[in-house]
Amino acid sequence: MRILWVKVGGLWPLDTGGRLRSFHTLAELTRRHRVTLVTTHGPRDEPAGLKARLAGCERIVSLPYAVPKQGTARFARALLRSWLSPLPVDLWKWRIPALREEVSRLMTAAQFDLCVADFLLATPSVPLNGPVPTVLFAHNVEHMIWKRLSHAEPRLWRRALLEVEWRKMRRYETEACTRARLTVAVSEADRALLAAHAPRARVCAIPTGVDTAYFTPNGSQETPGALVFTGSLDWFPNEDCIVHFGEVVFPRIREAVPDVSLTVVGRNPGPRVQRLAAIPGVRVTGTVQDVRPYVAAATLCVVPLRVGGGTRLKIFEALAMGKAVVSTTVGAEGLPLVPGRHFVQADEPAEFANAVVALLRDPARRKALGSAGRRLVEERYSWSQVVREFEARCEEVVAHAR
């Protein structure tokens, strides 16, 4: 197939779950298909590094674009304009005329069999019912993230704004799924949600993969009582959960296990996350080149998400390294894991703290959970297996379009 792949927000470095999922899918597809990638890069991204690591792409076009940041005049203008349009602000700020023009030009100039809109954020730049059949790669159910943010927001004025946003996002997401030839969700739970809201859409579920050769137990010594959290800290659900964990849950754990420590690993921590470093036993690393040493040194991994969508690659990566994981229901949502067999599930602060304390005191239980998790991802969720399924669904779309 000749594939046109469109993604906003950059792809390199691989410092978010979405980038990892997109990168590994593309890397596998380029082994067997002719792929043109059209993307954007911000001030901290590395387009040259991307081209070197996706050398199998027939062509890569990366346009400079800095997304408006909250609190800036550009963001205020985007917010105002989005209020006057059907687009929610999260999509309005990713409207990139130059990108849309480049996509239209390529669709006219080349004979593509398929276009992939990578994330809902790419759809303002892609004609979903245009001349090339389009697949929407939905890493999240976006409106559910905004809905959960609305319900978790304590300030009434902000909750009212978020209420408007999630309803606009639901309308747009429903329309986009309906217009695309196929929507690929990353879990059965997401597939069911999208299908319920867009009954005329064709939606399938393809699981998330993990690089089981890169994330592997390395036999290094664990630090006793060490907890680790990994994730992009400029994504609000990650910021929200780790601040809540550090301020509410971690002190409960420390009462029972005084020498417990918490390492927060991830890019772009804001002031709220940075302030956690003032709590005894907490370390905030900021951006790191490689998360594996931090995961390897940890006694267990915590995923205390309260809002979110899609699937959490951080859990698969921890399991691939043979680590025990304590996660909320939302944190493990969409992953094919059995609570009690592959991870420990806990939601309320006291319940989560008790689960962590129990595992810190039970090395045999930690080892059993980590071993079961490693077996699961190794046997069923390598990227080569997952992308073969993605590829087959794309080939069906192309066959039906002929």
Language-model segments: which ranges?
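Donor nucleotide-sugar binding/catalytic pocket of nucleotide-sugar-dependent glycosyltransferases
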Residues: 135, 143, 162-217
